[in-house]
């Protein structure tokens, strides 16, 4: 199991990007959350099996049909939050 935090920048608000992220996460059995930030970015935290999480993050980096991801900063977190599901916050 691994736990990641990511900040995604680009055209990621107002284009259904959080719903895209949630759908990808749920389809892959990931746990965590995604939300818009006040700065116009999208933030997420995700937990799951290592390869599944890494594949999920690659898909998020590619973006949805209506989004345009220009940057994605990621960090692996040392502790687990034991999320129950994957939800959209805020």
Curated annotation (Swiss-Prot):
It holds the Pfam family Acylphosphatase. Signal peptide: none annotated. Keywords: Hydrolase. One of its GO terms (molecular function) is acylphosphatase activity. It comes from the Bacteria. It catalyses: an acyl phosphate + H2O = a carboxylate + phosphate + H(+). PROSITE patterns: ACYLPHOSPHATASE_1, ACYLPHOSPHATASE_2, ACYLPHOSPHATASE_3. Residues 3-90 form the Acylphosphatase-like domain. This is Acylphosphatase.
